[in-house]
């Protein structure tokens, strides 16, 4: 079980936590408007909430694609969000020097999937003492996540969350292995597992210089994940996905947030009301 700021409990057996927001900080106004809606909906439904966004999308398909405001301006926007809404924050860090700076504002630091084996970055993140969200690389099997976890533990940080965002299935496609959630729980000693449902809907480079997506299937995939019994959901929404500057094809329309989360809350409550079934291998 992981605590965020002593307030939010992240545990596979506890009510799910929403790590939700926008893909990238397009503007201060978008961050504030989006967070306001997330706070309203999660407050109404009783869902613990952490706001997410990126200050830099350093791994865009094209050099011409929008990356974000950068570290300095991004942290100013994050500070405004935290001051206004009082919610914890999560963002991804791409270079070791950014970790300590981001940790001054950010509550949960994220290790990107494409960088999850970069030892210098792992050590820098671990040394901040912050809670760390480790994205499972699309190219790694669930048992291989233990190697990354052990790097963090050796570097002195066991405040870890694991996040699955799908696995490569041939070229330009991702699938989610629902059995993999349980495998990661088992090999890591039951670390909290969260599910990045919107990135799992990506279709890599299907638009040439940007990733496509299948947002019309987000509810199906999210319900399947919640049925396994997870610590949380990682979600991106946008007021108008068609004009989003990054990953719009995978984003949930923001006006669908309340009915979407209401279904998942009911399902999560039901699944976690069941007595565990211990079935020997």
From Swiss-Prot:
Principal place of residence: cytoplasm
Q: Where is the signal peptide?
A: none
Write out the GO biological process terms. Answer: keto-3-deoxy-D-manno-octulosonic acid biosynthetic process
Keywords from the UniProt entry: Cytoplasm, Lipopolysaccharide biosynthesis, Transferase
Where is the protein localized? Answer: Cytoplasm
EC top class, in one word? transferase
- Gene Ontology CC entries for this record: cytoplasm
Looking up InterPro entries in the UniProt record yields: Aldolase_TIM, DAHP1/KDSA, KDO8P_synthase
Catalytic activity reported: D-arabinose 5-phosphate + phosphoenolpyruvate + H2O = 3-deoxy-alpha-D-manno-2-octulosonate-8-phosphate + phosphate
- Give one Pfam family, short name only: DAHP_synth_1
Q: Name one GO molecular function term.
A: 3-deoxy-8-phosphooctulonate synthase activity
| Pathway terms, separated by semicolons | Carbohydrate biosynthesis; 3-deoxy-D-manno-octulosonate biosynthesis; 3-deoxy-D-manno-octulosonate from D-ribulose 5-phosphate: step 2/3; Bacterial outer membrane biogenesis; lipopolysaccharide biosynthesis
Q: What is its EC number?
A: 2.5.1.55
Q: Family per UniProt? A: Belongs to the KdsA family.
UniProt cross-references to NCBIfam families, sorted A to Z: KDO8P_synth, PRK05198.1, PRK12457.1
Its recorded name reads 2-dehydro-3-deoxyphosphooctonate aldolase
Q: State the organism named in the record.
A: Janthinobacterium sp. (strain Marseille) (Minibacterium massiliensis)
Which gene is annotated as encoding this protein in its UniProt record? kdsA
């Amino acid at each position: 079980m992981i605590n965020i700021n002593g307030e939010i409990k992240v545990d596979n057996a506890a009510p799910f936590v929403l790590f939700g927001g926008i893909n990238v900080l397009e503007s201060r106004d978008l961050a504030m408007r989006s967070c306001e809606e997330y706070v309203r909906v999660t407050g109404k439904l009783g869902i613990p909430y952490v706001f997410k966004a990126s200050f830099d999308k350093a791994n865009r398909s094209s050099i011409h694609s929008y990356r974000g405001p950068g570290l300095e301006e991004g942290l100013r926007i994050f500070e405004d969000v935290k001051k206004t809404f009082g919610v914890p924050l999560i963002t991804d860090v791409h270079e070791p020097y950014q970790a300590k700076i981001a940790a001054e504002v950010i509550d949960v630091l994220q290790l990107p999937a494409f960088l999850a084996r970069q030892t210098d970055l792992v050590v820098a993140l671990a040394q901040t003492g912050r809670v760390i969200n480790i994205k499972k690389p699309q190219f790694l099997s669930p048992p291989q996540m233990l190697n990354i976890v052990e790097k963090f533990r050796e570097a002195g940080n066991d405040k870890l969350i694991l996040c699955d965002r799908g696995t490569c299935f041939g070229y330009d496609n991702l699938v989610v292995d629902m059995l993999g959630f349980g495998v990661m729980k088992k090999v890591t000693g039951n670390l909290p597992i969260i599910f990045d449902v919107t990135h799992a809907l990506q279709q890599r480079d299907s638009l040439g210089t940007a990733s496509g997506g299948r947002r019309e299937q987000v509810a199906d995939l999210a319900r399947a994940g919640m049925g396994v019994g997870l610590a949380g959901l990682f979600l991106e929404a946008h007021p108008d996905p068609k004009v989003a500057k990054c990953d719009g094809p995978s984003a949930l329309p923001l006006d669908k947030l309340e009915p979407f989360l209401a279904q998942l809350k009911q399902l999560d409550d039901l699944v976690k009301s069941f007595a565990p079934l211990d079935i020997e291998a």
